[in-house]
Amino acid sequence: MIATSRAVNMNKESKHKKAVAKPCRERQTSVTRAMRPAVARDPRRLSTSSSPSSSPMSAQRRLSREEIINEMEKEQDAIVVRLLREIETLKEENSRLKNQLHHPVPARRSSPFFEGESAILDDDDCNYGYTLDTPKLKLTDGASRHTVLPLTPKDSMTHISHSARRSSRNASISNGTSISDTIFPIETKIHSAPTTNRNLPSADLPHHTLLPRSLSGISSSDLTESGALLHDRRRRSSNYSLDGSNSLKADLMAKRFQTGSLK
């Protein structure tokens, strides 16, 4: 009985302790639960705690976006300006090239004295004659090569003299005469006679048709003396023939024996 009473008392004390301890826990939890929502739901604390932390971050974000947009606009403006300048330079170059195509620059400027004159080129003599008919360059053919043009300067006279020398040279070569005949045409005209008149005396020859202007007023005795001098000069130059053949020299010696000029 004693053991049972003690056990009952111990059980009662433990139950009483548990009952006393429970309301304290419940009071603490109720107080804490009542305090926590009041602190969390206070609008003043929410405004004071959240506004200073959120406003500078949003301001920084807005400023960075505006700066990026401004920088992009500046870059686009610079690109547009550069492209406009390139377009202007290309337009100027295009207009300059068009002007050069429509109005070509002359390669060389001619003197005003020869602007309205045309050059006539001779293939053999390379002598130039100028006429006043057309401003273009002309090349003459073989038929009109030796024609005399009106209003020709000094070069055309040299052209005529060269052509006369060329014709006399060709005639001397075809007849088998020496270079001395072409060098001294006056003495060949005076002392050379055709084949039919070789046996005639010198007095019967028609001197008036063969004498040049400078010898027209000279007597026959003077002519014979001058003819002898010319034949001496001709004798010195007769050693040179065109091709160095002995047949031409023999012909010349025969001519001199017939005319009686050989001493």
From Swiss-Prot:
Disulfide bonds: none
GO CC annotations, alphabetized: cytoplasm; nucleus
Localization terms from the record: Cytoplasm; Nucleus
Region entry Disordered, spans: 1-62, 149-176
PTM sites of type Phosphoserine: 172, 192, 214, 238
Compositional bias ranges of the Low complexity kind: 46-61
UniProt keyword annotations, A-Z: Cytoplasm, Nucleus, Phosphoprotein
Main location: cytoplasm
Cited function: May be a component of a protein phosphatase type 2A (PP2A) complex. Negatively regulates SIT4 phosphatase, a modulators of caffeine sensitivity.
Other remarks on this protein: Present with 2100 molecules/cell in log phase SD medium.
Name this polypeptide is given: Protein phosphatase type 2A regulatory subunit RTS3
Top-level taxonomy: Eukaryota, Fungi, Dikarya, Ascomycota, Saccharomycotina
Gene field: RTS3
